[in-house]
């Protein structure tokens, strides 16, 4: 997603670029991805002139926070009229592919393997790769690593250059895509039995997230258990079973690598930082990286001015750490407020008081809205 977005911004600005993608277009188009486009990202697409072409889905303005089955609707405070959208990452990727390839005639090469990076100090960067036609190599000015946690970009940086900051929360989420739409508002729920969330994934489907053990796998969660736990954690016996299309297990953890650049290689999104999905900020932080980097690359290409590029890491990291803190707070609060065997009844009651604050304190509500919208 971040690579396609960056390429679209550069192409719009007249800056040439090549996108290497390890899988074919058909698989890219159907691959399921989580994410909601926050208000800051909507504003970003508007500023690049692509919002009308890329964004779709209902406005993301409300969350139903439920404690032991009792729901309260949190409405984000929008002083500037810039709401987020429930445009899923899969929908955004498909729109980006159509715009970049079919409209802009951008250069994207699918099904590549054996990607290798040469980022030497005394010559221009080189990238080599293979595809069905054979081996290839090209020379470029900059390499942008949008290849996620296990890609070749960060791995190409010598040992000792980057510092890794990480935290493991000690539990995981089961993410289940189901044939059942969200009938009201998106849900973030807790009960003494644990955490559960339901978020929309198109008009007919939704994705449920259930707190589980790090050691759990598909054999531990047959479909019947998934629905039993959803009913139990939402305290709602009227919820009916539906088809479960897929199940993923996501460990709750946070990671930041710094700096996010080395010579002419720049890291973006999951290649540089990971967040627990509780705050829905992973995709939006990647889009923030893309926005800052795209502006810097355009400035370097048009004006031969590298100042913004050289300052890329120091520009984006303070924002990333703010949202790491927000995501950690959301994760701790939503899970401490649930199953008391997690961290005890004191932490449970303190976390539930934090949730009460969102509805009792205008100051807390405004701050929470700023983070939800990506505008803090």
What are these regions (language model features)?
Residues 14, 105, 140-141, 263:
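Short, well-ordered alpha-helix to beta-strand connector turns
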Residues 16-17, 51, 107:
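Residue-level detector of anion-binding/catalytic polar loops
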Residues 280, 295-376:
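C-terminal helical "tail/cap" subdomain of flavin- and related membrane-associated enzymes
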């Amino acid at each position: 997603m971040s690579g396609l977005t960056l390429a679209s911004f550069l192409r719009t600005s007249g800056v040439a670029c090549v996108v290497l993608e390890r899988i074919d277009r058909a698989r890219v188009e159907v691959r399921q991805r989580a994410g909601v486009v926050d208000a800051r990202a909507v504003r970003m697409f508007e500023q690049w002139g692509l919002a009308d072409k890329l964004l779709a889905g209902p406005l993301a303005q409300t969350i139903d926070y439920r404690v032991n089955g009792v729901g309260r609707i949190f409405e984000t405070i929008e002083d500037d009229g810039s709401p987020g959208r429930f445009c899923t990452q899969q929908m955004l990727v498909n729109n980006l592919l159509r715009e970049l390839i079919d409209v802009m005639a951008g250069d994207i090469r699918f099904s590549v393997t054996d990607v290798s990076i040469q980022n030497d100090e005394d010559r221009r960067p080189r990238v080599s790769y293979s595809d069905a036609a054979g081996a290839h190599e090209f020379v470029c000015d900059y390499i942008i690593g949008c290849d996620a946690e296990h890609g070749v970009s960060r791995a190409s940086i010598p040992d000792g250059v980057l510092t890794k900051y990480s935290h493991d929360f000690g539990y995981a989420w089961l993410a289940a895509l189901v044939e059942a739409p969200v009938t009201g508002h998106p849900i973030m729920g807790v009960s003494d039995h644990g955490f559960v969330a339901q978020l929309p994934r198109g008009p007919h489907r939704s994705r449920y997230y259930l707190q589980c053990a790090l050691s759990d796998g598909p054999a531990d969660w047959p479909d019947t258990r998934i629905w039993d736990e959803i009913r139990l954690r939402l305290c709602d016996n009227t919820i009916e079973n539906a088809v479960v299309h897929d199940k993923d297990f996501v460990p709750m953890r946070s990671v930041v690598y710094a700096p996010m650049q080395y010579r002419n290689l720049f890291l973006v999104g999951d290649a540089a930082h990971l967040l627990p999905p509780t705050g829905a900020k992973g995709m939006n932080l990647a889009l923030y990286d893309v926005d800052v980097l795209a502006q810097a690359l355009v400035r370097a290409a048009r004006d031969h001015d590298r100042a913004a590029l050289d300052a890329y890491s120091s520009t984006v990291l303070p924002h990333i750490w703010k949202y790491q803190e927000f995501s950690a707070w959301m994760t701790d609060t939503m899970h401490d407020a649930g199953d008391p065997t997690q961290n005890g009844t004191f932490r449970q009651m303190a976390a539930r008081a934090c949730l009460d604050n969102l509805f009792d304190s205008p100051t807390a509500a405004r701050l929470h809205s700023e983070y939800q919208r990506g505008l803090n």
